[in-house]
Amino acid sequence: MTVDLRELAEPGSPEELLVRRLDFDRLPRHLAVIMDGNGRWARRRGLPRVEGHRAGVRAVRETVETSARLGIEVLTLYAFSTENWRRPRVEVWTLMNLLKEYVRRELVSMVDHGIRCRPIGRWRELDRSVVDILEEAIEATAGGDRMTLNIALNYSGRCEIVDACRRIVADWAGGKRADIDQETIGEYLYTAGLPDPDLLIRTSGELRLSNFLLWQIAYTEIWVAETFWPDFGRRELYEALLGYQDRERRFGGVSAADAEPSGQPAAVSDGPGSGS
């Protein structure tokens, strides 16, 4: 693919040195991000937690723009989980308003750059004002064919699987289904029709999945950045992509270096969890 490096880094910058090392034909088709660390970023600066969320919007904007310019097909951002309702009311209120503000401000840009906005999760249970702006974005960006932007809102990986099972049962009762397999379940997930994530980035150094895309990340490569989300920029994104390209995805098999020579019997393993 053809990429304009001038859109990805300033000439002579550290980011340019990183982006020149990327193999643009081996980028992830689907990139997922757990945007973590806003509160700790604010606390280290003596600021209220909500200021960390405001600062995090810049990282969202830059990650979306850069991913689209790189040619990544799908970007999924974990914006608000079902567990986040436990946070202070003022923090939840701020998050919802920042979401509405971001979508309003970026809507024209998303349309111009061919970005399709697709909320996932139980987002229709949010406040009516949030639902309205999301529905407007869905309609306005429906023709976007450059990148799909999934925004996970009121999202839970377990709830996603439960919702999929409920819909399957309902269709089965209506005579629409004869059997259930992995492919069937995939067709009923929030991300139906999209490839599973190739790379999951989590910021802030935490080693948790936080109930995110539990079905879809079975074979996803995971990159943990020590950076808090508000400080996550192009450099950190390029480092994660380079780390991804340095890995060999085996999907439960063995690497070429570890494969048995032709004609030699393979050793018996203790199961899929044995060895590395």
Predicted regions and their residues:
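Flexible, compositionally biased loop and terminal segments
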Residues: 1-276
